[in-house]
């Protein structure tokens, strides 16, 4: 996993470097469609779970911080059969991208039935 994260970081850094002055006009979001359970399974891996992570990069990202909280790995802090707790819904992050970077306020059409709450990860602007 550490090697894969290093590869991702190096790839994102190269992408950012290649953009030169245009990097400030771009917002990059990396995310997974699933998280991983905290406990190892019978195959020495981990099953799909709830909690995951997202990375944001770009000129309008309020950087240098972690945008969620860490509830911990104790049994009483896990959800169900060993899932990490979700502390920031991915739709809130993507809703903020829609609002502040795409200038699209139609969040009720993009995320039907979800009351999106921007979390202050981005500044507005082109």
Q: What name fits each language-model region?
A:
Residues 1-126:
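Feature marks hydrolase-like catalytic cores characterized by long aromatic- and Gly/Pro-rich stretches
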């Amino acid at each position: 996993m550490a090697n894969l994260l290093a590869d991702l970081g190096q790839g994102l850094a190269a992408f950012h470097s290649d953009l030169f002055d245009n990097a400030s006009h771009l917002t990059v979001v990396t995310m997974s469609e699933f998280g991983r359970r905290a406990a190892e399974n019978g195959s020495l891996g981990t099953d799909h779970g709830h909690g995951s992570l997202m990375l944001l990069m770009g000129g309008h990202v309020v950087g240098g911080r972690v945008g969620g909280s860490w509830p911990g790995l104790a049994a009483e802090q896990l959800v169900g059969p060993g899932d990490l707790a979700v502390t920031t819904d991915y739709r809130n992050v993507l809703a903020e991208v829609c609002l502040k970077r795409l200038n699209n306020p139609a969040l009720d059409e993009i995320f039907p039935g979800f009351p999106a709450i921007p979390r202050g990860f981005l500044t507005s602007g082109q």
